């Protein structure tokens, strides 16, 4: 199948604390994407610094790491046709004020510093992020019974 890919999605501490985990998972499942891995954890500062290494020179970096370390996160890997691009569209803009209603951030967020969810921005970054958060044996390969109803 063309463009079958995987993406990394993380529900941030504010999304967990606000009880939005089920709603977010529901949206990805209803779209037709397949969950292949999931963890509930409190990421260490060191792990978060690795994850956000491309932002290390930005003035908001220390606050971002502190915020992400402030509580548990739900780390997930989703698979599907064009899941990276479509997943980003489902999330909405990084700044919730620029997000359209119907997107996760458009429906549930107000400020950029509390935007409840992270999603890989490219296939390359998805591969990097997935390998940072999950071991290969933690990625479960299976065929969903809904597969033939979602894909031609």
From Swiss-Prot:
Active site per UniProt: 118
GO CC annotation terms, alphabetical: cell periphery; cytoplasm; lamellipodium; nucleus; ruffle
Residue ranges of the region described as Interaction with AKAP13: 1-66
E.C. number: 2.7.4.6, 2.7.13.3
Location(s), subcellular: Cytoplasm; Cell projection, Lamellipodium; Cell projection, Ruffle; Nucleus
GO terms (BP aspect): CTP biosynthetic process; GTP biosynthetic process; integrin-mediated signaling pathway; negative regulation of apoptotic process; nucleoside triphosphate biosynthetic process; positive regulation of DNA-templated transcription; positive regulation of epithelial cell proliferation; positive regulation of keratinocyte differentiation
Catalysis performed (reactions): a 2'-deoxyribonucleoside 5'-diphosphate + ATP = a 2'-deoxyribonucleoside 5'-triphosphate + ADP; a ribonucleoside 5'-diphosphate + ATP = a ribonucleoside 5'-triphosphate + ADP; ATP + protein L-histidine = ADP + protein N-phospho-L-histidine
Pfam families per the UniProt record, alphabetical: NDK (PF00334)
Binding sites annotated in the UniProt record for ATP: 12, 60, 88, 94, 105, 115
Subunit and partners: Hexamer of two different chains: A and B (A6, A5B, A4B2, A3B3, A2B4, AB5, B6). Interacts with CAPN8. Interacts with AKAP13. Interacts with ITGB1BP1 (via C-terminal domain region). Interacts with BCL2L10.
NCBIfam families per record: PRK00668.1
Name of the molecule in the record: Nucleoside diphosphate kinase B
Underlying gene: NME2
């Amino acid at each position: 199948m063309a463009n079958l890919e995987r993406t990394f999605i993380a529900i941030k501490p504010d999304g967990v604390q606000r009880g939005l985990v089920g709603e977010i998972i529901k949206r990805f499942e209803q779209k037709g994407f397949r969950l292949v891995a999931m963890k509930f954890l409190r990421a260490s500062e060191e792990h978060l610094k690795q994850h956000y290494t491309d932002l290390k020179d930005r003035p908001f970096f220390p606050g971002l790491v502190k915020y992400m370390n402030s509580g548990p996160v739900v780390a997930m890997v989703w698979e599907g046709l064009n899941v990276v691009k479509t997943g980003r569209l489902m999330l909405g803009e990084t700044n919730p004020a620029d997000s359209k209603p119907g997107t996760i951030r458009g429906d549930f967020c107000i400020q950029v510093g509390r935007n409840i969810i992270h999603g890989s921005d490219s296939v390359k970054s998805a591969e990097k992020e997935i390998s940072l958060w999950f071991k290969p044996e933690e990625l479960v390969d299976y065929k969903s019974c809904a597969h033939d109803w979602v894909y031609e």
